[in-house]
Swiss-Prot record:
N-glycosylated. It is found in: Endoplasmic reticulum membrane; Endoplasmic reticulum-Golgi intermediate compartment membrane; Golgi apparatus membrane. This is Endoplasmic reticulum-Golgi intermediate compartment protein 1. It is a multi-pass membrane protein. Residues 1-26, 276-290 are cytoplasmic. It comes from Homo sapiens (Human). Glycans are attached at residue 74. InterPro entries: Erv, Erv_C, Erv_N. The keyword Transmembrane applies. The gene is ERGIC1. Belongs to the ERGIC family. Possible role in transport between endoplasmic reticulum and Golgi.
Length: 290
C-alpha cells in the first residue's frame, strides 16, 4: 500500500451528521467569540501604543555639551522699568557676569511702567545662581518693586512628550504680584538631568527641577539691601532616563495565540460539562417517569 501522508493529520474531521448542535453550545460559542474579539482589540491597542519606561543611574548623560546647560527664562515685572532690569550670573567656577544681554529681550509693559524679560543663556554644571535685579542699572532706584510673574524657566531641550509628567517647567505660572514689593525672592532649585530616547534611538537632553522658595526683606549694617529675584541652583548626581518601547511582534503573536487557544479550550470544557449534566438530568427525569 502506498504511504498515506494524511495519517499525520491530528485534526481529524467529524462529519456534520454525527454532531449535535445545542442552544447552550451556540450561546457559549457567541460569548467565546466576543471575548476573543475584546481581548484581541485590547492586545492590539497595547501593541500599537508606545510605552515609556524610566530608569535611574549616576552619570553625566550629556558629555558633549561642554559642561554647559542651556537656560530659558521668561519673567514679567509689571512695576519695574526695562532700563532697570538686568540679569546677573555667577557660579563656583568664578563666573561673575552683571547685566547679561546676549540672546535676551526686554518688552515694556503697562505703558513702560513694567517690563517683560525673555532670555536664553548657558550656565556651568556647577552650583551657582542667576538673578534678576537692578545691579546693572546706571542709577539704582530707591525702592525697586520686585513683584513678578514667572512664565517659563526651563533647562536643556524642550520635551513635547505627553507620556511623561515631569517638572520641566516647575515655576511656570508662579505669581508673586501680591508679595511685598521691597522683598527679595529666593528660588532654590535642584536640577535633575533627564534623557529621553525615542524608538529610533535618538536622545534628547533636558533637565527637571524641584523648587523651594522664600521671600524676605534683607538688611545690612548700612541699611536695607536692594531686593532681587534669585535662582540658586545645584545639580543632582542622579540622571532620569525615559525610553520609548513597543511590544515585540513575536510577543504580540504569542499572546494572541494564547488568547484564542485558551478561550476555545475553556469554552469547550464548559460546553462539555453543561452538555453532560444536561444529558444526565434528562436520564434522571426519564427514570422517574418509568
Amino acid at each position: 500500500m502506498p504511504f498515506d501522508f494524511r495519517r499525520f493529520d491530528i485534526y481529524r474531521k467529524v462529519p456534520k451528521d454525527l454532531t449535535q448542535p445545542t442552544y447552550t453550545g451556540a450561546i457559549i460559542s457567541i460569548c467565546c467569540c466576543l471575548f476573543i474579539l475584546f481581548l484581541f482589540l485590547s492586545e492590539l491597542t497595547g501593541f500599537i501604543t508606545t510605552e515609556v519606561v524610566n530608569e535611574l543611574y549616576v552619570d553625566d548623560p550629556d558629555k558633549d555639551s561642554g559642561g554647559k546647560i542651556d537656560v530659558s527664562l521668561n519673567i514679567s515685572l509689571p512695576n519695574l522699568h526695562c532700563e532697570l532690569v538686568g540679569l546677573d550670573i555667577q557660579d563656583e567656577m568664578g563666573r561673575h557676569e552683571v547685566g547679561h544681554i546676549d540672546n535676551s529681550m526686554k518688552i515694556p509693559l503697562n505703558n513702560g511702567a513694567g517690563c517683560r524679560f525673555e532670555g536664553q543663556f548657558s550656565i556651568n554644571k556647577v552650583p551657582g545662581n542667576f538673578h534678576v535685579s537692578t545691579h546693572s542699572a546706571t542709577a539704582q532706584p530707591q525702592n525697586p518693586d520686585m513683584t513678578h510673574v514667572i512664565h517659563k524657566l526651563s533647562f536643556g531641550d524642550t520635551l513635547q512628550v505627553q507620556n511623561i509628567h515631569g517638572a520641566f517647567n516647575a515655576l511656570g505660572g508662579a505669581d508673586r504680584l501680591t508679595s511685598n514689593p521691597l522683598a527679595s525672592h529666593d528660588y532654590i532649585l535642584k536640577i535633575v538631568p533627564t534623557v529621553y530616547e525615542d524608538k529610533s534611538g535618538k536622545q534628547r537632553y533636558s533637565y527637571q527641577y524641584t523648587v523651594a522658595n522664600k521671600e524676605y526683606v534683607a538688611y545690612s549694617h548700612t541699611g536695607r539691601i536692594i531686593p532681587a529675584i534669585w535662582f540658586r541652583y545645584d545639580l543632582s548626581p542622579i540622571t532620569v532616563k525615559y525610553t520609548e518601547r513597543r511590544q515585540p511582534l513575536y510577543r504580540f503573536i504569542t499572546t494572541i495565540c494564547a488568547i484564542i487557544g485558551g478561550t476555545f479550550t475553556v469554552a469547550g470544557i464548559l460546553d462539555s460539562c453543561i452538555f453532560t449534566a444536561s444529558e444526565a438530568w434528562k436520564k434522571i427525569q426519564l427514570g422517574k417517569m418509568h
